[in-house]
Amino acid sequence: MYFFSIITDLSLTNLTKIHYLCKRIPETEGKMNIIEAKFAGSCTRASQKPSRRLPEFAFIGRSNVGKSSLINMLCGNSKLAKTSSTPGKTKLINHFIINDSWYLVDLPGYGFAKVSKEGREELRKMINDYILRSGEMVILFVLIDSRHDITKIDREFLANLGENGIPFSIIFTKGDKLGPNALKAQIERDREILSEEWEEMPPMFASSAVTGAGKEEILDYIQQYINL
């Protein structure tokens, strides 16, 4: 099954509720501080990724969700991942080695803004190949724009992950665009929408690349998996 297309073969209306299959880990002590973040390489297929095998934590979202800005905020480097006012700028799978112990993986966005039909197909295959064949991927962080209700394409994407047993967590981006109460209400609204398809919710984080909100929680969550 392909995960992402403008039209998917997974019907949300006929879908039996999905059980979240990601292994729940016990909370452990440990804080993560990113001391060093370096670009390690780009590829178009999982077989071409860096040869050094380390845990991988991948980030993906619809075009213009603020993925590059979030990655830069997490790493404390405003120039690590290239940001652009043009949606869909990331066209390769980019690996960054963090603290010489794990990879942060920047995946192309789905939604394919301003991309040709052939380009959409190539990006779809590239994303599928990485998610299905990267044996080192620990968690896929799916980024959702907190300013709006979760979209149909986001829901279909998450449902496909669930049906295929892909471990993931959700990060709500651009939290600074809403007040605290409005942000909380919007996340609860999205929880209600997702509860139509999910028996239980995956881990969720609220974030802002502008204020740094969510940085500590997301990095400490990653650290818990590295500690296993």
Language-model segments: residues:
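Short, positively charged and aromatic/hydrophobic N-terminal segments
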Residues: 6, 17-23
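Conserved G1/Walker A P-loop phosphate-binding module
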Residues: 30-107, 112
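Canonical P-loop GTPase G-domain recognition
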Residues: 34-43, 178-228
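Conserved nucleotide-binding/hydrolysis micro-motifs of P-loop NTPases
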Residues: 44, 89, 102, 109-112, ...
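Switch II of P-loop NTPase G domains
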Residues: 90-93, 108-135, 147-159
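Conserved C-terminal guanine-recognition region of P-loop GTPase G domains, centered on the G4
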Residues: 129-200
